[in-house]
């Protein structure tokens, strides 16, 4: 059986026999290549067990033809497929078989449906799961969990129809003493109308994390009394501190350069009691180039002799360090300094999302559970308008687009670094993080499609597509960390130092069979979870037994016929 197992809504579009997969690790393998409207599937019966390569079309970045009909040499005529998840796939066709053209055309059509006016596969996929993952995040419930509304913060529906800001969610948490009319004036002074709104409030000190975009200061140093009053209101909502910190994610030279485009940063003269801190995190273009360099050194082969210097030259871990260090400073100001903070970059949907979501993960144990993490992604990334469509390029053949960048990948990498430093603090495991990244590209689920809440509502994604959380929550045992201990009120302070960071081998080098763990970790997780459940059950039984014994002892102690010496129960 060489055909792929099909998902509901998946259909075969093309098939070519006698194709050779040029595996960079084990050499050439001959088999059958199938293209469906969702995946590329290669199967070879030459190996035992049969060799299978299964990749979603959404992961394809570009497809190139290699060699012409007159190419000499074995395996010199075929296709090179460059993927978004580090891999490159190379297939050789027989020139006389005429299968290359057909496979190429179908790959170009179904890997890039947006460029061909076709629907993404998420709209065709019809799997039914026990739970509707689109209902995981309810903003009203999440704000209520944080104690909002309260005497200082209210929920505004001014953006109900996305008219104040088309990249913000419908419901916004804002200072209680700033009326909606004033919010409009603040929006006119913030890039793309992205006003400072609440992300998180400390349950004890009431110190807050608010997020926004840069102020439109420009070269002339424009001011807005409404914006200044607004930030003062944010500061005043926290009685513990008479100061507010503004964390600008950018390097200061970039922030200054933005003035020429009408943007800029808050001057400490205009914003009384505010302190401005630059976090030196580079822009999307620098990050894209860093990942390109990383791919060069990890795939397909690793050069042992210069591994450390090669890794250093990519600057990837340096960028991860700066993002983690920035989030750590924010979390520390809120937790230890009891001070409210405002976070922004240029537009407030890339570096800002990285910083707020990571600092929330450090401060609030709820987000370290599986469901809490799903809420965090829905809230800080999806509802606040991270431009997934542009950064990932779902179904778009324009692989050289300057808007592409691994912003969300860096966030997940930072989360993985935290799970390494705190192995018992997170309910989810590494496989959970890898699954999220795989489906960032796959276009199987609707979760990461579009670039704003408004677009998702307009496209009716919750009605027409399946949520990734529906799938994950239907098999939680696969994604659960058996070492997890629920200390919900613990604040995590990861060490953001190069000595404590390492390359995420389980993701970036997972295609190399030599890097696979000797023992399948996944199976071990399941065994540990079963053992944990068994021990938990025993503990509960013993606790019940102790309760029953102490109850019967106290009953006997209270009866008139009780002897003078009480019976002591030692457990």
Swiss-Prot record:
Its main location: cytoplasm. Pfam families: GRAM, Myotub-related. The active site is at 345 (phosphocysteine intermediate). Residues 521-553 form a coiled coil. Its EC number is 3.1.3.95. GO terms for cellular component: cytoplasm; cytosol; early endosome membrane; membrane. InterPro entries: GRAM, Myotubularin, Myotubularin-like_Pase_dom, PH-like_dom_sf, Prot-tyrosine_phosphatase-like, Tyr_Pase_AS, Tyr_Pase_cat, Tyr_Pase_dom. Residues 133-508 form the Myotubularin phosphatase domain. A 1,2-diacyl-sn-glycero-3-phospho-(1D-myo-inositol-3-phosphate) binds at residues 258, 283-284, 346-351, 391. GO terms for molecular function: phosphatidylinositol-3,5-bisphosphate 3-phosphatase activity; phosphatidylinositol-3-phosphate phosphatase activity. The keyword Coiled coil applies. Residues 1-67 form the GRAM domain. It comes from the Eukaryota. It is a peripheral membrane protein. A 1,2-diacyl-sn-glycero-3-phospho-(1D-myo-inositol-3,5-bisphosphate) binds at residues 258, 283-284, 346-351, 387, 391. Residues 544-571 are annotated as: Disordered. Signal peptide: none annotated. Keywords: Coiled coil, Cytoplasm, Endosome, Hydrolase, Lipid metabolism, Membrane. PROSITE patterns: PPASE_MYOTUBULARIN, TYR_PHOSPHATASE_1, TYR_PHOSPHATASE_2. Regulates the level of these phosphoinositides critical for various biological processes including autophagy initiation and autophagosome maturation. Belongs to the protein-tyrosine phosphatase family. Non-receptor class myotubularin subfamily. Homooligomer and heterooligomer. This is Phosphatidylinositol-3,5-bisphosphate 3-phosphatase MTMR2. It comes from Gallus gallus.
């Amino acid at each position: 059986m060489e055909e792929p197992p099909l998902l509901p809504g998946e259909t075969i579009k093309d098939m070519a026999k006698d194709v050779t997969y040029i595996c960079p690790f084990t050499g050439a393998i001959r088999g059958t290549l199938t293209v469906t409207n969702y995946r590329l599937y290669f199967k070879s019966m030459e190996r035992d067990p049969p060799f299978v390569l299964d990749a979603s079309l959404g992961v394809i970045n570009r497809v190139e033809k290699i060699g012409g009909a007159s190419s000499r040499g074995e395996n010199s005529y075929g296709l090179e497929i460059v993927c978004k998840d580090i891999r490159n796939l190379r297939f050789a066709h027989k020139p006389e078989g005429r299968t290359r053209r057909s496979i190429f055309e179908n790959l170009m059509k179904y890997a890039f449906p947006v460029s061909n006016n076709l629907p993404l596969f998420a709209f065709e996929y019809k799997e039914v799961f026990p739970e509707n993952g689109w209902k995981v995040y309810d903003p009203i419930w999440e704000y209520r969990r944080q104690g909002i509304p309260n005497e200082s913060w209210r929920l505004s529906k001014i953006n109900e129809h996305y008219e104040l800001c088309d990249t913000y969610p419908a419901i916004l948490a804002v200072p209680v003493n700033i009326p909606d009319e004033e919010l409009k004036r603040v929006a006119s002074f913030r890039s793309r109308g992205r006003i400072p709104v609440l992300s998180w409030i400390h349950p004890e000190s009431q110190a807050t994390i608010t997020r926004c975009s840069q102020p439109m200061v420009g070269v002339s140093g424009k001011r807005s009394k409404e914006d200044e009053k607004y930030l003062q209101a944010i500061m005043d909502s926290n009685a513990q501190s008479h100061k507010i910190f503004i964390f600008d994610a950018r390097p200061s030279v970039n922030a200054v350069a933005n003035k020429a485009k009408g943007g800029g940063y808050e001057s400490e003269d205009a914003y009384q009691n505010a302190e401005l801190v630059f976090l030196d995190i580079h822009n999307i273009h620098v990050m894209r180039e860093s990942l390109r360099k990383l791919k060069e050194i990890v795939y397909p082969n690793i050069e042992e002799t210069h591994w450390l210097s090669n890794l250093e030259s990519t600057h990837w871990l340096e960028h991860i360090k700066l993002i983690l260090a920035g989030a750590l400073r924010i979390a520390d100001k809120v937790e230890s300094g009891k001070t409210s903070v405002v976070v922004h970059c240029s537009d407030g949907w890339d570096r800002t999302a990285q910083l707020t979501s990571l600092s929330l993960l450090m401060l609030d144990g709820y987000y370290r559970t599986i469901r809490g993490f799903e809420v965090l992604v829905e809230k800080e990334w999806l509802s606040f308008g991270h431009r997934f469509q542009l950064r990932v390029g779902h179904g778009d053949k324009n692989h050289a687009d300057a808007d592409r960048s691994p912003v969300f990948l860096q966030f997940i990498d930072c989360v993985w670094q935290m799970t390494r430093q705190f192995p018992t603090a997170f309910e989810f495991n590494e496989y959970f993080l890898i699954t999220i990244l795989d489906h960032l590209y796959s276009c199987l689920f609707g979760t990461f499609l579009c670039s704003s809440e408004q677009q998702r509502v307009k496209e009716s994604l919750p009605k027409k597509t399946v949520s990734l959380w529906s799938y994950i929550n239907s098999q939680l045992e696969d994604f659960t960390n058996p070492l997890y201990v629920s200390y919900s009120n613990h604040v995590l302070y990861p060490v953001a130092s190069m000595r404590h960071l390492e390359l995420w081998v389980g993701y970036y080098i997972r295609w190399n069979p030599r890097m696979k763990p000797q023992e399948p970790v996944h199976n071990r997780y399941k065994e540990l979870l079963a053992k944990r459940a068994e021990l938990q059950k025993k503990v509960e039984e013993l606790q019940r037994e102790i309760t029953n014994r102490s109850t019967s002892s106290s009953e006997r102690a209270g009866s008139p016929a009780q002897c003078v010496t009480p019976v002591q129960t030692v457990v």
